[in-house]
Amino acid sequence: PRDQLLNWSAREVPQRRHLVAQNSRFLILPSTGRWPNLASRVLKLICQELPGDWEKHFGHPVLLVEPFVDPQRFRGTCYRAAGWQALGKTQGYERRGQDFDMDTKHPKELWVHPLGPGALEKLRAKELPPTLQGKGKPLPPPVPIASAQMNSLFDFVRKRLTDPRHRN
C-alpha cells in the first residue's frame, strides 16, 4: 500500500526506503491509568522530535512514519485519533533481515504519517532532491537473464549441491 501511495516502482523502493521510519513498537497498556488523549499526544511528540533526532543519528532526513498494526489484536485507534492515514492491509510478508521477506500469511494494517509539509510530494517526485539522494541502497545491475532461466539455474544448483548435515 505504501509504494502505491507514493507511486514507487520496484527499483525505487531500495533507493527511497531510508526516508521512511517504521514505528514498530507503540502500545499504551490499560494499567497506565486514564489519561485523556494520551496516545495521540505521545504520537504528536514523537513526530515532532523524530526528524531532528533521525538526521542527527543517521545523517539524512526521514519524511514518513509507518506502523504496522496487527488487526487480530489491535484496531489502530490511537493512529486514527492522531490523524494518521490508513492505507489498507499488507500482503502478509514480514521483514526478516535487511532484504529478506518471509510470507506469514498474516496481513497487517498499514498507517502512515508524513513528517512536515511537502513530505509526500518529495517522496513521490521522479527525482529526489539532492539532499535526499545517495543515502539509500545502491541499485543492483539488472539481471541479464529471464526468470525461466533463473529457475533452471536454481534447479541446476540445487540438484548438484548436497547438504553436509545429512552425513551425520
Predicted regions and their residues:
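Secondary-structure boundary/capping micro-motif
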Residues: 20, 24-28, 50-57, 74-77, ...
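Acyl-donor binding region in acyl/amide transferases
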Residues: 1-117, 128
